[in-house]
């Protein structure tokens, strides 16, 4: 309501008094904030996709010459936490093991987990990525021919599998997991 009236808002915070007036509010898809960190590169591509892999969702935004194409904004309702939950549940059911951490296997790092558990984790992670790629393809996005910029902590976790999978033609990774919050 106060935005429409453009009135000043007075408040106290930590013992100091403030008076502010909000003149303009902009809202962007979450993935775009991360894209800005790579703008000089992205503006040279006629088309690129920002793929922000989070805990509960994977958000996708199409860019044309570095600018958001808001006609193509997708959200896949399965992030890495849903992957973890699936792996943990299946591992418990098949091997009566409670997994605390499967990141080492996903990152292809040394682990004490037995071979069959490692294979299960790799297999389920591969299926997770395939399901996501199919979700995109159903919406007209083909990662085998597109430049894809991956953001978020989930993308760094899955980076090795994405690169080794050879399904994404031009993967670029934003190393800063806080890029969306800048």
Tell me what each language-model feature is.
Residues 1-48, 68-80, 106, 114-182:
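Nucleotide/phosphate-binding catalytic cleft detector across ATP-hydrolyzing
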Residues 51-55:
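Active-site-proximal alpha-helical scaffolds that flank and shape metal-associated catalytic sites
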Residues 58-62:
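Short beta-strand scaffold segments in enzyme catalytic cores
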Residues 63-110:
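Glycine-rich phosphate-binding loop plus the immediately following alpha-helix
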